[in-house]
Amino acid sequence: MLWKRTCTRLIKPIAQPRGRLVRRSCYRYASTGTGSTDSSSQWLKYSVIASSATLFGYLFAKNLYSRETKEDLIEKLEMVKKIDPVNSTLKLSSLDSPDYLHDPVKIDKVVEDLKQVLGNKPENYSDAKSDLDAHSDTYFNTHHPSPEQRPRIILFPHTTEEVSKILKICHDNNMPVVPFSGGTSLEGHFLPTRIGDTITVDLSKFMNNVVKFDKLDLDITVQAGLPWEDLNDYLSDHGLMFGCDPGPGAQIGGCIANSCSGTNAYRYGTMKENIINMTIVLPDGTIVKTKKRPRKSSAGYNLNGLFVGSEGTLGIVTEATVKCHVKPKAETVAVVSFDTIKDAAACASNLTQSGIHLNAMELLDENMMKLINASESTDRCDWVEKPTMFFKIGGRSPNIVNALVDEVKAVAQLNHCNSFQFAKDDDEKLELWEARKVALWSVLDADKSKDKSAKIWTTDVAVPVSQFDKVIHETKKDMQASKLINAIVGHAGDGNFHAFIVYRTPEEHETCSQLVDRMVKRALNAEGTCTGEHGVGIGKREYLLEELGEAPVDLMRKIKLAIDPKRIMNPDKIFKTDPNEPANDYR
């Protein structure tokens, strides 16, 4: 009995972990599960199962002189409990708040260590106010941070190995990290929610190169900071193109993180269909390459699918191999106007259902056409101010293209179009498509020229193609009734559309919020999604829960904490991982 009382006294100051401790005492706190078990964890494991008081006493004495203190051990054990190893999903209520570093002296020391990783050269980091502001918000962002929500420093690494060292230091010191590339996202994706201790890692300055081009295999490996327009320019010289075309300024890393698409997605797919492999640095600094270069593989889990669309919450993508597509031998642009948005949307649905293969199918409402004229963003300012469809029609020869034009025209006429214009040459093709590419900027420029305080709420939803005309028509009526400046742009071929709403006052902001809420719920009721390509970020977390339900979101949370148990990667995005998250309305 004496040895039992002795054991009880020895264990009590450390923890009372019960059965869970026995199962998980040797858990390694890293993004992957490899590596050796430290001596303190081995002691704890064997102390519970030991049948000999002598052996127990020896191991306990050994622990007293080991590198780790009892407090360190307890901290690790408590973190295991938070991950909840028993269940397949993880509820927010089962978590405590993450233990980020807040000590200013220690933060300064970590920042100096991070600078040393980059050679302590001023061009490799910045804490200038203008840079901190630019890496926290944009005027076209839908959700804005408070003045205090700024990164502590911005780092500009040159290599994957430097990114690995940066993340290892941040992981070891519980410092939040926000990945950054083009900064064109719209739902607060790169907003630093944690005040005073966030590190922003920007790949755009130095990691923006082509690594390897395999023309015979139609793929290209690039660094994550390469703008997609630069990639397209590079490929164009070889008669090729990149399949995705998101907003101007977007970079490959952000395209992956946000699962971007754009106007060409109808023909070439979204980012997840255009990825072959990725190099990713996990939160603890582990470097992972998702696979080699096959166009298909059934080997193991689909790691590409896990990281595409993860919004920087699971790691930092540093390189990617993406598909190249052969440019159409012949292509034209057709512009077709309708009296109502319902007719225009119905035309898009009918074309999709007919099996006519088009390269792009875009819808702009009459308000957008008016704003394009008013902003003088294009060479011509006499666009018909009615709901308008823009088509890219391509093929292997002019004859094939002309036949497709006739088919599109026939469907458009069945849906009561009142004008049909198509480009006769390349210059006219660029002129006609230009109106589509400047849509967002036209809304911003047209109103900000009159009122500098104007802000824009930009959002998107996607619905099954058969529901597109109904949902877009109801959304249009709702926005028109609000009396706010608004416009709609749709990727009509895949049922995805965007709403642009301008506001100035807190009251108008609240009106915007209600309009967006009804728009999203309308899409969900039609079996659609709260976002087709903008992503969740901060702005649509509540809708993700409404769209999928608790169990899928709890599963995502489980995956997040399995890879990032310290919750350092882009905190508070997609779904909550802190039950005591600081309140902020992000206006």
From Swiss-Prot:
Catalyzes the stereospecific oxidation of D-lactate to pyruvate. Residues 146-327 form the FAD-binding PCMH-type domain. The keyword Cytoplasm does not apply. InterPro entries: FAD-bd_oxidored_4_C, FAD-bd_PCMH, FAD-bd_PCMH-like_sf, FAD-bd_PCMH_sub2, FAD-linked_Oxase-like_C, Oxid_FAD_bind_N, Vanillyl_alc_oxidase_C-sub2. Induction: By D-lactate. Induced during respiratory adaptation. GO terms for biological process: lactate catabolic process. It comes from the Eukaryota. Its EC number is 1.1.2.4. Binds 2 FAD. This is D-lactate dehydrogenase [cytochrome] 1, mitochondrial. Belongs to the FAD-binding oxidoreductase/transferase type 4 family. One of its GO terms (cellular component) is mitochondrial intermembrane space. It catalyses: (R)-lactate + 2 Fe(III)-[cytochrome c] = 2 Fe(II)-[cytochrome c] + pyruvate + 2 H(+). Its cofactor is FAD. GO terms for molecular function: D-lactate dehydrogenase (cytochrome) activity; D-lactate dehydrogenase activity; FAD binding; flavin adenine dinucleotide binding. Keywords: FAD, Flavoprotein, Membrane, Mitochondrion, Mitochondrion inner membrane, Oxidoreductase, Transit peptide. It is found in: Mitochondrion inner membrane. Disulfide bonds: none annotated.
